[in-house]
Amino acid sequence: MARVFPFRGIMFNESLKNQLGDFLCPPFDVVSEDLKEELYDLSEYNVIRLENGKIYKSDNEKDNKYTRASNLFDSWLKNKILIQRNQPTFFILEESFEVMGKYKKRRSIISNVDLYDYEEKVVLPHEKTRKKQKQDRFQLMKTARANFSRIMSVIEDKDSNLINFLIKETSSDPEFEGSIPNMHEFKIWIIDDKDKISFLTNLFELENIFIADGHHRYETALEYKKIIEEKSSRRMMNLVSMNDEGLLLLGYHRAFSGLNDEKLNLLINKLKEFFIFSDVKWEESFFEANYSDEDKIIMVNNNSSTSLSLKENIKSTYEALHTVIESVLSPDEVINHIRYEHDSEEMKRKLDSNELQLCFFMNALSKNYFIDMVSRGKLLPPKSTLFYPKLPTGLVIQYLNDI
């Protein structure tokens, strides 16, 4: 099964640890231009400058966001803004956050993981990727020779060996801690004890790895290994136990805008082949459609709210809705008329202001369903999973010159 390794991770200088939260950013694919501007203003050392820097009209082959990231990375290393650890270690990350008024903690191991082709059935994907995003990540890897963000992956951990280890280790004082503006608090521990390292490497040899967030980055690493450098055979990941109570799998809602009445009516009629319709009050169903494992959808327009319950022979709300959408809309119509959103309050606000015409509030897939489907090699419909919260970028960096 999976082979994991400690590594000489790069972190911000310990003298800057009180400012560490100002240096971090979300994953590259969820950073809007407005947020990017805010992160640039937050700190001259915010890692967005490395992970997904600004693009200028004057950019050319020698001066672009990739070359600027590479040069800045080298500069931060030279000036000891970033420091590479002397010895290979594992890192433990504990994230604390609030969801729907409840306080949660998620714990994970940061490690290097051997790269496996999907056909080897060791690292398992659950979604298709897009070429444009992989080209972007490839160019950054090639130019900067580093990975600034970690892939989030999960393991079944049936005997709870990983989560029990993490709970025990996080009972001591951390090496680093901080908070990320508008996100969450974090703590980091260093694992350099030989016996503990051996325990972890042996533990993962019995596990499959399920990619939770980071398919584009994983496939980019495979491509990099194939084209650029065969010895670059590992990728930095956060590995989380499925038994961690702080591992939240939330729903990704669907919103429609700009569809004509004919398409809308066709969509709703087609849904009746898969779902049983019943009227509900929005106020009663609002929270139900955000953090529940129940297999139903709440459909809302400006005039009514409807609960859609799966018929007996149908297994998944996401698959059923995806089947209906594909049968009614062309690929271009899907791109032009559907938005995906995990914030149900924000989506309802847009619906009330007539920015949207029809919304489907989705419940989360259960963890067991996710494991079962992915283990059998099934790819899930687009935007079926949201492992919340997304990992902050910049806590630990993987240097490709030091595999």
Residue locations for each model-derived region?
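Surface-exposed, charge/polar-rich loops and edge strands
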Residues: 1-403
